[in-house]
Amino acid sequence: MFVIKSNLPAWLFSGLLALAAPLCMAAEEEVTADQVVSALESTFEVHPGERRNHTKGTCAVGEFVGSPEAHVYTRSALFSGKPLPVVARFSLPGGNPKVPDTAKIPRGMAVEFRLPGGSLQHMTMLNTPVFGAASPQTFFDDIVAKKPDPSTGKPDPEKIKAFKASHPDSLPQAEFLAKNNPPPSWVNSSYFGIHTFKFVNAKNKITLVRWRFVPEDGEKQMTDAELKSAQPDFLEQKLIDRVKHGPVRWDMMLTIGEPGDPADNPTLMWPANRKEIKVGTLTLSSAAPQKGAACEKLNFDPLVMADGIEPTNDPVLLFRSPAYAISFGKRLSGN
């Protein structure tokens, strides 16, 4: 299992990740990280110096205060009760830097938590409660199916239809997006950790958990009429304007798993009656366009974890680290 423990300064850690780009997945994987990154480049074209996925984004900074009550489940310093600096990035999936903010696709929030001693904790989240693939192969096939037809400049509807028919694990997220319009602002959405993680406490007891961040500004959705009339770029400026009037906050809610809950499949939800507790508050106090801002050069690898939090064997979660490293290495080199 490939897990990064981050007791290194952020600048040095990022440099080491660039060297990790050649990492490949275990032999049993159907596709490699290189193939996925190449597929993203083929479908969305190469934008030098930019992320291959979640290319369009906005930076924000602030702090996180975790609740010591979480120490029942984890020894992580993330929940010390002391303010910790954070860098966040909001983004839209895909490699198109000009994707319209009205697109009915997921919204992402990635956060780097800076813990005492130089260690880091990353969380990469979406505003959908499930992911769109149970395996790297499905994720790869989805990217390939979305490649624009040269004659139309748009994805081939027949290829999209065939993909959905042959990949039922892609349907739960697609159905959620079809039923729920996008939020009018980054601050009006909950963000889900998608994957299941292991919390390890001081006695080395392991608890399976999932988490989500719930906005204090409330969850809202745009109407169909608002989607039709909205400009293609409004999310960034709305966030910048919002934080000028005061900080924005999300409560971190932890869901406690029970025996039998799916641990390795991010397309499956847990039962709604699982125990849930508040374990912290994320506060963002400023925001800026990503060019030259705090989040631009960060690699929000979800396997960057501080002591007390560990990954499960979710194949999608484990696949993300080498894919992120390859993309990050290309960005550092200006490609």
What is the predicted function of each stretch?
Residues 2-12:
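Bacterial N-terminal signal peptides that target proteins for export
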Residues 1, 19-21, 256:
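Generic low-polarity alpha-helical segments
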Residues 11-22:
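Bacterial N-terminal signal peptides
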Residues 27-335:
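Active-site-adjacent core segments of small-molecule enzymes
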